[in-house]
Amino acid sequence: MRIVIQRVSHASVTIEGVCKSAIKEGFMILVGIENADTQEDANWLCKKIVNLRVFDDENGVMNKSILDINGEILVVSQFTLHASYKKGNRPSYIYAAKPDIAIPLYEYFCKELSNALGKEIGTGEFGADMKVELLNNGPVTICMDTKNKE
């Protein structure tokens, strides 16, 4: 699984002109799933996300987690995170999992992340054409890949 985490002041996702989810301070997370991804990958990411200390403490030091600030999370599926651009100029998405594999794992990830956060999270709609708006705070943007845990 590959994710892009952005620390935001607020974020929302709109589908066909209707706001599906909106959050205030917290994380906007893009998630891409490939065929080899498992629930163990999702569990590892959930633990990392809720404990990631990238919010300022009283001294202006990034020392607080999303749990510490009672922040919110918006998750949006993003198969293009697995784009291959090795040959030519048109990306290939051959590494992105097909919906029959990706949807159950995406739903599992969202459920487990909500459990880890201790409250509901906002989500997009898998496979939909979405408009995502956010105000990146910092900016703070972090990429994680369960196949390359650095």
Regions found by a protein language model. Name each.
Residues 1-89, 103-150:
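N-terminal, polar/charged subdomain of small-to-medium soluble alpha/beta proteins
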Residues 96-104:
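A short acidic, glycine-rich active-site loop
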Residues 88-96:
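Short hinge/gating elements
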